[in-house]
Each structure stands twice: as structure tokens, then as C-alpha cells.
Amino acid sequence: MFSNLHSSSVGPSVLSVSLATGILVTGFAGPAMAATDPAAKTVEIKAIDLHTWKLDPATGWSVRKLIGKKVKGPKGENVGEVDNIIFGPDGKVHELIVSTGGFLGLGEKNLAVKWADVTVSPDYKFVTTPITAASVKKYGLFDGIPKSSGPLAERDWRSSELIGDYVYLKGNLHYAYVRDLIVSKGGELQAVIVSPDVGFSHGDGSYSGGYYAYPYYGYGYGYGHGYGHEVGWNPGNAHYNLPYAKADITDLLPYAYRK
């Protein structure tokens, strides 16, 4: 699907301090409520060194490729197709959203299946679930979701909330578009695949073709844990912020990513 094609001949990262020890972020500048808000707390921000980070193509799968695949019941009967994937604040897959598409005699309905109850075929062409016509009412969309989680509470989120989002570099530099998410076989979000904007060029003036892979930065990287430091992404954010400057990605080569 993709392979690590980063250049091996690179100089020291501009982020050497944060890569080695992390940046201890304190005293966030923001609303007055930050001092007493339980969500405003000290956060240690660590950026992963892109020149040593590797994404093993044998250990992950593409969210985009799983969306739209057939969903089968325990006896191999058609149930519908994969409509969306739900992640938790911990970056792990929590549920699969299934569109019945008229199967099971329900018309067009969406069902939620716990990821622990889902089996993905080795070739990722279909998934098997426990859903049957008799058990369908067990898979309501809102089962297990609290009625009110509060405005600052961390929450589950849909893959479609991040795929298609804009990507910024440090300094609010416009950079790219989120193309895909890569999940480990254990169900943990590993990486974000991005497509640079046609107007984004490297330091030598060349333009960035192809796709690039970056570590996933979600809850715990600034957003939702304080004010004044915008790193990573939380559901509802206007864009996905990478903790890298333009100089930090100049030497990176594209991933061999198959659409």
C-alpha cells in the first residue's frame, strides 16, 4: 500500500529540542477561565522525528479502502456496507458504522457495531459482523453514548470528520488536505496521509507531488488540554495542525501510497 521512502541523508531536525525532551507547555495564554478550567493543564508536547519514524505497510490498513466494503452476517449473508469508522479519544477504533442499504428488510438504516465484534477479511474486501435480522435492534447508533458529555469532554469521532480536513504547518502555514487514515491491525490510528496543496513548494522551488505520511496527533497534543497551544487535532477543529515547520519537511520524499 505504501512504504517508507524518507531520505536517509538529512541534517539535524529544527525540532531537536522538542524531539529529544519534549516541550513542556505551561501558562497557556487564553481565556480567563483557563486558570480554573479542569481541561486547562500542563501538557508535554512531543513531536516525533520524521526522519527516524517509520510506518510499516505490513501492519496497517487504509480507512478509505475499508469504507464502502461489504458487511456480512455470521453466516456470510449480506448485511450492508461500511459507512464510517468511529474512533475514541484514545485514537483506537471503537465502532464500525454499517449502512444496511435495504438489507434485513429495514430499508436504509445505519447500525453501530463494536470493533471487538468485527472481523476484517485478510484482503480487506469485506467484514463479518454478528448482525442478523433477529439481532438488528442491538446495534442502535446511540447505545452506550451518554446523554450529555459536557462542552469540554473528549468524545468519539467519525473518520469522515478528519478525512477531507485541511492541514497546516507551524505558523498557520497552509499545507495540505487529509486524504486517508492508516490504522494498525490492533485497531489504533497510526498515521495521517496527506496530499499537499498544488501551490505548496519546497525550499528549492519544486512542488510537492504525491502523498505524505505523518504520525497521528490527536487528543493529548495541546488541543482540549489547555489554551494557546494548537497542535494536532480534536473533533470540531477548523483544521489539522502538524507540529512541524516547513523546513522540517523539505527533505521528505512521498510515500508510495495506493489510492
Regions found by a protein language model. Give the residues of each.
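Hydrophobic membrane-targeting alpha-helices
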Residues: 22, 26-31
